[in-house]
Amino acid sequence: GDGKEADNRHTKNFIKKLSEVDKNGNALIDLVLVILDGGSRDLGTSYELINKVIISNFGQGKENRILVAIHQANMAMKGRNWDYAKNEPNQRLVNFLEEKVRSVRDRVYEATGVIVEPIYYSAGYKGWGEQSRPYNLSKLLYYIVKAIPSEKRAIRVPWFYRCMS
């Protein structure tokens, strides 16, 4: 979005960072979390980044190291079909979000052969007297922790995994 020259520079930096390894040859980057805008219809640039930059340059085990999250689930249909009292999508919005998940999964798989399992969430907000609670944020955190190699986790909380199963 910053122009062709800046996009090329960012792409080279991504590839360089994804290729970095430690002294034992292990990748320094364990996980890439790609956050897509739930309200956007044009995800072409995002697919190009996922398919041509991240997946193409991520090395071994990429299937388990790429997470895709669709942010602003509450705004995916411009704020319609969100039950603000229950802080959750109604069935029409769930269907819309599930279709977006399926579309992202299928487009990535068709282009790369890599299976990703996108999730949707809303981070919530607070300000100027308004407030919205997070939705599916703990699920996103669970997916992140689950995807990080256990030996690199700073903390191991067995109850967290039991409650998320």
Each language-model region and where it sits:
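Conserved GTPase G-domain substructure that encodes guanine base recognition and part of the catalytic core
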Residues: G3-S165
